[in-house]
Structures are given as C-alpha cells and as structure tokens.
Amino acid sequence: MPNASRVVIVAGEESGDHHAAELVKQLKAVYPDLEISGIGGKHLRAAGVHLISDLTRYAVTGLTEIIPFLKIFRKAFQDIKQHLSTQKPDLLILVDYPAFNLRLAKYAKKKLGLKIIYYISPQIWAWKGKRIHLIKDCIDKMAVIFPFEKTIYENAGVPVSFVGHPLVKKIAAAKDKHSSRTSLGLPLNEPIIALLPGSRHSEIERHIPILVNTAKLLTLDSPKLRFVVPIAGTINPDKVKAYFSNQNLTVTFIQGQAIECMSAADFVIVASGTASLECALLEKPMCIIYKSSFLTYVAAMYFIKVKFLGLCNLLANKMMVPEFLQYDCNAIELSRYISNFHNNPNQPESMINQLAKLKESLSSSQADCSLFDLVVAELPEKNA
C-alpha cells in the first residue's frame, strides 16, 4: 500500500479537470496522505490538489485561436517542468491535452526518468498517427476510454488498459426528462430544444449566431417551441445572452448543468466534443455542429484521416447522428433537418436504439480495470 507518495497530475481543459478530480477524490479517500499537485482547474483545486497553473481558463482550439495565449502556455510549461524537477514525483498522470502533455511526457521521461500514466489517449487514430512512437518511448501505461484504442496500442506494443468511459457512470446518475425539467424550472409539456454551442470562446462566436437563426426559423412553424442554453463555466454568461436579446425567442439560460439541460430537452443541437458524446449516452435525439476558422478547416481537411467528426459516429463507424460542419453548418440546413426529423416518427426511435447500443459498448462492465486500480498498481510501496 502506498504511503506518502507524490503524484503530479496535469489536466489542461475543463473536461479533463473534471475527470481527473474524480480520480483524486477516490485516491484521497483511501490514501489521505498522498501528495498531489499539478496543473488543473476548479475541480482539481476543490479535490485538494495543489495547483501550479490553471490552463482551463484558456479554452482554445485551432491554429489561429491559440496564438494570443502562447506566452501563457509557454510559462505554464516551464513552471511544470521546474516543479517536476524539484518534486521528482513517484508518478506523473497526464490527462488528455496532447499538444501540451506529450511534450511534457518527453521531458519527464528523457530528462527525469519519471513513471508516467496517460489517461484519455490523443486521437492518434484521427490525425498525427506517428505520435504513437513518442507514446511508446515515453509512456509507461496508457489508460484508454474507447475499446478500439486498446487494439491500436496493443498492436504497437504499448502497455494499455481499457478503463471504461468516465461519462457512462456520470450519465447513469443523470435525472430523467421529467425530473430535469422540474429541477431547471422548465415547463413539463412544451417542446424544448437544447442548444449547446461549445465551451471555447471561438466556438461561441461562430456557433451562437447560427443557433439563434435556427431557433428563429423553427419557431415560425412551432411558436410554442422553447430553448434551453447551458453556459459553460469558461464563458461569460452576458456574452451568450446578448446574442439572444430582442430575438423574440423563449430561451432559458442555465449556468453549467449541460447534462441536465440535454436530459430535459426533446432534441439537442450540440457542438462536436465531449458534450456530443454526453448527449449520445443520454440516448437523446440530436445533431452535431461545428464551424472553425478557414485556416483550421483547411488544415483539418489535409491532416485528419477519419470519416466523421462526432465521437458517437466515429465509434459506430457510421453516420448515426447527422453532422453539420463548416459550410453546411447554417440555419437553413439545421432547421430543415430538425423539422423533417420530428415529422418522421421512425427517425427518433431508430436513433435512440442505436445510441443505446453505443452506450453499452463503453460501459465499465466491459473494462479491463478501473483507472483507480491502475494508478494504485503503479504507485510504489513505501514504508511508513
């Protein structure tokens, strides 16, 4: 049993911060003397982690969006390198965030010889597949959340365990539609569409105008239609609300609680990312949107090698849920699809049945072990 071991954990985005915090809570409950520090956000801080930096506030993606924050990221990288060199932890846990974490893994292994677990694999199956060579050289154990990733790493000779997807357990605890509406103060018998534009500033700027116009078109045919918009903690609520002002729409804004908002809805329009998988695991009728800068889009067309953007479609290897991307991401296309979807009684049932099968494939009952057990197995035995 580990005693007074030192662990450093690095999670640079809000979703990773949340997942990492759940692990820390489990570890602290069993090993209260465990010293845990690193990079994270409000969830890791609340779990008792001593934070060196918080990068979750700078939620950016794409080639052009990251430029204004490069100085901040460079400083955080230097700070965590210094921290690792000083602390020499028994275990380094890297959570997602590959552009930052793979560079850190190379330094931590080559310069310091640290033991490293990487939780939530880089999407090497989508782009930059050659990163698997760096992973093989630097990572002691991959903890993957998709079953097919295990096969990829096994074939490359990388130690790997499938630990189940963290969202499955989270979704299992979610309220049903009726309870969610009651909790959020939403009417029980009126049609509701949830609008999830994303958690990054660039996503808000590109997606919200499209969602507002989509909502206006939909209400022309369905005047009683209501909308609920959960606002991510990384976004200024006033900025989101300003887009909807004076638009003659019935909109409820909720701080956070994205899962509850999706559960309360009859249909969800969601930006590609973690929320789209949450929606799929809720077995909720949905469509996926995404619009990036032109430069990012061109780069993606050149480098990304998968057929789909939505995680549920990637996992199913088919277009289970429609994707409206870049130039197809517009109010006319979206409103037309949603209207046709609800006028065809077989479509919602078919989508829900397919999503239920996907959910089962990701459950922890199919996992090799839990992330907690994997981490504990890698911690050293120490004398009291």
From Swiss-Prot:
GO cellular component assignments: membrane
Catalytic activity field: a lipid X + a UDP-2-N,3-O-bis[(3R)-3-hydroxyacyl]-alpha-D-glucosamine = a lipid A disaccharide + UDP + H(+)
Enzyme Commission identifier(s): 2.4.1.182
GO biological process terms, semicolon-separated: lipid A biosynthetic process
Pathway, per record: Bacterial outer membrane biogenesis; LPS lipid A biosynthesis
GO MF annotations, alphabetized: lipid-A-disaccharide synthase activity; phospholipid binding
UniProt keyword list: Glycosyltransferase, Lipid A biosynthesis, Lipid biosynthesis, Lipid metabolism, Transferase
Biological function: Condensation of UDP-2,3-diacylglucosamine and 2,3-diacylglucosamine-1-phosphate to form lipid A disaccharide, a precursor of lipid A, a phosphorylated glycolipid that anchors the lipopolysaccharide to the outer membrane of the cell.
Name the UniProt record assigns to this protein: Lipid-A-disaccharide synthase 1
